[in-house]
Amino acid sequence: MEKFTKLTGVAAPMPIVNVDTDMIIPKDYLKTIKRTGLGTGLFAEMRYNDDGSENPDFVLNKPAYRKAQILVAGDNFGCGSSREHAPWALLDFGIRCVISTSFADIFYNNCFKNGVLPITVSPEDLEKLMDDASRGSNATLSVDLEAKEIRGPDGGVVKFDLDDFKRHCMLNGLDDIGLTMEKAGAIASFEKKNAEQRPWA
């Protein structure tokens, strides 16, 4: 998993509440277990018209936001079913950070396991960041995970809190496998000792 230390990029505003995982990645795209290629299905029902053409009014189809790396979203983002394809789709599109006032628990935890940083802020701070993200080509935010702060285009700073363990995992690029590999030496030592003490096992 790629480390997340500091990210400076275009932030796209999506002031929609209760965006569920089916909206993030519709069920038609769940037939694969590959993590790549899902970016085309991200927000597909909002991104595309019935004939498959792009909806020009959808934020990620607008020229200023096509390469957005940060999403500023409405409350209760990621609710609904527990599909891990949702953070996969965000990451494959290029979005590495989602900022909201709240997230569904399963989606929130899945993000950390897949290299997407979900940040929770107050309604007042979200309103400011949403305004920053609405500046089109000037909608650039800097997310500093080490300092736990978001810096806007005008230099304003929004502080955020994050569990120390989750922060450690993101800073060091550790998913579940990475965490296990951190203990590889201890595991090998235990197995050797166990084999010596219990040769019959």
From Swiss-Prot:
Q: Which domain of life is it from?
A: Bacteria
UniProt pathway annotation: Amino-acid biosynthesis; L-leucine biosynthesis; L-leucine from 3-methyl-2-oxobutanoate: step 2/4
User: Which residue ranges run through the membrane?
Assistant: none
* GO CC list: 3-isopropylmalate dehydratase complex
Instruction: Spell out the SUPFAM superfamilies in the cross-references.
Output: LeuD/IlvD-like (SSF52016)
Question: Keywords for this entry?
Answer: Amino-acid biosynthesis, Branched-chain amino acid biosynthesis, Leucine biosynthesis, Lyase
Q: Which reaction does it catalyse?
A: (2R,3S)-3-isopropylmalate = (2S)-2-isopropylmalate
Q: Name one GO biological process term.
A: L-leucine biosynthetic process
Q: Which cysteines are joined by disulfide bonds?
A: none
Top enzyme class, one word, equals: lyase
Molecular function terms in GO for this entry? 3-isopropylmalate dehydratase activity
Which CDD domains does the entry link to? IPMI_Swivel (cd01577)
EC number per UniProt:
4.2.1.33
Q: Family, per the entry?
A: Belongs to the LeuD family. LeuD type 1 subfamily.
The record's subunit annotation is:
Heterodimer of LeuC and LeuD.
Task of the protein: Catalyzes the isomerization between 2-isopropylmalate and 3-isopropylmalate, via the formation of 2-isopropylmaleate.
Looking up HAMAP family in the UniProt record yields: LeuD_type1
Q: What is this protein called?
A: 3-isopropylmalate dehydratase small subunit
- Organism field: Mesorhizobium japonicum (strain LMG 29417 / CECT 9101 / MAFF 303099) (Mesorhizobium loti (strain MAFF 303099))
